[in-house]
């Protein structure tokens, strides 16, 4: 599977999640023996999210994922045979502030030193900066099926998009040409 961030047409299309997001949270909480109901209550979110009676926006989805990672004590959310220690993402995000260029910051964001492998890279192609996630050799945990991996790769793309937007302090939809997502099963591209 390869994911490439090159663009996104309209960031507003990413404001509401589908039923897959809720189902993923429920499955993850169950597999980790964590109460999703308690997490929703602690975060002040309506419990009707579980029954899909109220929408779940992406910000709240990522807040719930963060809380699950704390409960599980693994920022990879049980996806890797090499769990990520709590604080890993905060460490990487804090380190971005010291970078002098957006290119250097995006290269730091690639997380390679944490994942112990060359799964992410940043390339300059003509005048385009390309962030590539290549997880072909990533040490996925045995319980990670292809659908779950694809779902999480899409979330990684959204997360990286948000981080880059924060770094330049502006929506990046105007600066990016396309978002491309490929797996062995499917290919999705937004222009």
Per-region residue spans from a language model:
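N-terminal low-complexity or simple alpha-helical regulatory segments
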Residues: 1-132
């Amino acid at each position: 599977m390869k994911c490439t961030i090159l663009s996104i047409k309209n960031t507003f299309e990413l404001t509401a999640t589908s039923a897959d997001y809720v189902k993923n949270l429920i499955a993850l909480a169950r597999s980790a023996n964590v109460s999703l109901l308690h997490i929703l209550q602690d975060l002040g979110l309506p419990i009707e999210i579980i029954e899909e009676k109220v929408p779940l926006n992406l910000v709240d989805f990522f807040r719930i994922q963060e809380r699950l990672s704390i409960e599980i004590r693994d920022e990879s959310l049980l996806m890797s045979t090499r769990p990520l220690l709590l604080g890993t993402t905060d460490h990487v995000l804090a380190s971005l502030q010291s970078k002098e260029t957006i290119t250097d910051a995006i290269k730091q964001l690639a997380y390679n030193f944490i994942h112990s492998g060359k799964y992410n890279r940043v390339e300059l192609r003509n005048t385009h900066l390309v962030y590539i996630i290549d997880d072909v050799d990533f040490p996925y945990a045995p319980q990670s099926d292809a659908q779950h991996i694809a779902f999480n790769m899409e979330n990684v793309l959204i997360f990286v998009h948000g981080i880059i937007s924060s770094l330049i302090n502006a929506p990046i939809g105007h600066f990016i040409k396309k978002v491309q997502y490929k797996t062995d099963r499917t290919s999705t591209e937004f222009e």
